[in-house]
A protein has these predicted regions:
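Hydrophobic h-region of N-terminal signal peptides that target proteins for export
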Residues: 1-6
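Mature extracellular "passenger" or substrate-interacting domains of secreted, surface-exposed proteins
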Residues: 7-138
């Protein structure tokens, strides 16, 4: 007789996030793993939201660069205090454009930047942003 054993529930956390800059307004939610890696960062596994009113439709694959920004792969990591890494996360919008917000620790002073690419027109920008993220309490 075989017994049915329920699969363990996938543990995850939900974070709300937003960033703004010159002509930029993006916000939404992240789903992350529930357990941090050895450096205290959580892997972003899902994304929802919009950038300048255009829906975000997918998260860029870890280890890949957004189209139009070769050599700068994303790691989709965020730490408990809401800081992104120097690789940041990447996403695609419904308009076919891509964004890669990240923490620019190489700048003086350090701060957040967004790389935005428009592959159809080879558009590219890299602008300072103010980024915030917070855990959404489980109900």
């Amino acid at each position: 007789m075989a017994l049915a054993v329920p699969l363990p529930e996938q543990a995850s956390r939900l974070l709300s996030w937003s960033y703004t800059g010159a002509g930029i307004a993006a916000s939404g939610t992240f789903t992350t793993d529930d357990t941090p890696d050895s450096e205290g960062s959580y892997k972003i596994t899902g994304i929802a939201g919009s950038r300048n009113g255009v829906a975000i439709i997918s998260l860029e694959t870890v280890g890949e660069a957004i189209p139009g920004n070769p050599g700068f792969s994303v790691d989709n990591l965020i730490n408990a205090s809401g800081r992104l890494t120097s690789h940041g996360f990447g996403f695609r919008t419904a308009a076919g454009n891509y964004a890669n917000p990240f923490y620019a620790d190489f700048r003086t002073p350090p701060g957040f930047l967004e790389v935005f690419t428009q592959p159809a027109s080879t558009g590219f920008s890299e602008l300072p942003i103010e980024f915030v993220a917070a855990i959404v309490p489980k109900s």
